[in-house]
Curated annotation (Swiss-Prot):
It comes from the Bacteria. (2R)-3-phosphoglycerate binds at residues 189-192. This is Glucosyl-3-phosphoglycerate synthase. Requires divalent cations for activity in the following order of efficiency: Mn(2+), Co(2+), Mg(2+) and Ni(2+) ions.
Length: 403
């Protein structure tokens, strides 16, 4: 039986697999006559040397409903930037490559820094933020979809299903979040399965049915990097430069729109990308990600007026451990009935590492409750620097016109 269950406070749009991709894309082509759609692809140059990017480019060649594709390129030399431009020129849709390491973009980053905007931390968050600024400079762009560029089994169904809810004229969604299964011969998505979700549920047990926490618990894959939103929402969104990007994005959406305009969409059957090993260092990898996520949660809740004490954090640690143990029991049963490999010992070891990440997050939050500020919404940036949009357009155009 197809899954049609609606849980939580947002709408869930499952894939019943009874409709062809071609039919979906045909509708999107009709919608594109009135609502221009932009696809934003944050990428490192190294991803062009891996197995995922060639497949993504091949799939994008067949899309006809997109107004523009913006590739946000990080960690690339001039030669590598030129190589990427040539590769992306194979796509029929108009493509603009934003070279964040180039001298023109670096000048803009310095100008923003001098004006008091926090853009000093390089990474995906900053690149996405600057790329959004470029896209929003085009008044004809209506909806923006974003997905990562390390998806080995990529299908053009992903952007189609992400964009459909926010551009369909008979629907009223402003934000859609992608979800999928992270399954091969075993379950992946450890940070979501045995850290994020147990932590959210531990917080609910302690703080009660807080609307924000219930909202976060409604997402099937809150840490996915795939989402779409309309420009009027995007222009008021602040973005985190840290690993807390996805959680802070959901927080900003929560504050800037209403539940009935938020949905989650099943975009793929399964999702394969590069898997990170769980190292015990709290300053890198998945543990750093978990720590940043926890700090982001604490700060958002503190903004809502919650007071955190030493007793609260002691209770949270033990409650999280209990919720994580419940999760292990559930995923062990799920793996057994589906014939998957499930290493309970490795999962328990991962929880112990995540407890260290949680302790680190608590310590850093107490020492610095404000932490790394979110990068300002573009509506504020434009108010302070009225010419920034023109400068951004000029920098990208000149970079893309150079031989």
């Amino acid at each position: 039986m197809a899954d049609f269950f609606q849980n939580g406070v947002i709408t869930t749009l499952q894939n019943f697999r009874n409709r062809s991709l071609e039919e979906l894309e045909y509708e999107l082509e009709l919608f594109s006559k009135r609502r221009n759609m932009v696809l934003l692809l944050p990428a490192l140059y190294s991803e062009f040397e891996g197995p995922a990017m060639p497949k993504i480019i091949q799939e994008l060649k067949d899309i006809r409903y997109l107004y523009k594709i913006v590739l946000s390129l990080d960690r690339a030399t001039e030669e590598e930037f030129k190589k990427v431009k040539k590769i992306m020129s194979e796509i029929n849709t108009e493509v603009k490559v934003i070279w964040h390491d180039g001298p023109r973009m670096q000048r803009l980053y310095r100008e923003l820094e001098e004006a008091g905007f926090n853009v000093s931390i390089p990474g995906k968050g900053r690149s996405v933020w600057m790329s959004l600024g470029y896209i929003l400079s085009d008044a004809d762009a209506y909806a923006i979809a974003l997905h990562d560029c390390d998806i080995v089994n990529y299908s053009r169904e992903l952007p189609a299903r992400l964009l459909y809810p926010v551009v369909h004229p008979a629907l009223d969604f402003e934000f859609s979040k992608g979800y999928y299964a992270r399954v091969t011969h075993k379950l992946y998505g450890r940070v979501t399965r045995i850290f994020y979700t147990p932590l959210i549920r531990a917080l609910i047990r302690i703080l009660g049915c807080n609307r924000f926490l219930v909202y976060l618990d409604s997402f099937r894959y809150a840490l996915s990097g795939e989402f779409a939103f309309i420009r009027t929402l995007a222009r008021g969104i602040r973005i985190s430069p840290t690993w807390g990007l996805e959680v802070s994005m959901l927080s900003e959406v929560y504050q800037n729109t209403s539940f009935n305009r938020i949905c989650q969409v099943e975009v793929m059957d399964t999702y394969e990308h590069k898997h990170q090993k769980l190292v015990k260092s709290t300053s890198e990898g998945l543990v750093k990600m978990a720590s940043d996520i926890a700090k982001t949660l604490f700060r958002v809740l503190a903004h809502d007026g919650f007071v955190f004490s030493e007793a609260f954090f002691r209770t949270l640690l033990t409650t999280y451990l209990q919720e994580a143990r419940y999760a292990i029991e559930k995923y062990n049963a799920l793996s057994l009935i589906n014939g998957l490999t499930y290493d309970r010992h490795a999962e328990i070891e991962a929880i112990e590492v995540f407890v260290d990440a949680l302790k680190k997050a608590e310590k850093e939050f107490i020492e610095d409750p404000i932490g790394v500020p979110l990068m300002s919404a573009w509506v504020r940036v434009r108010a302070a620097l009225p010419e920034i949009s023109d400068k951004l357009i000029r920098a990208v155009e000149e970079d893309n016109s150079d031989d």
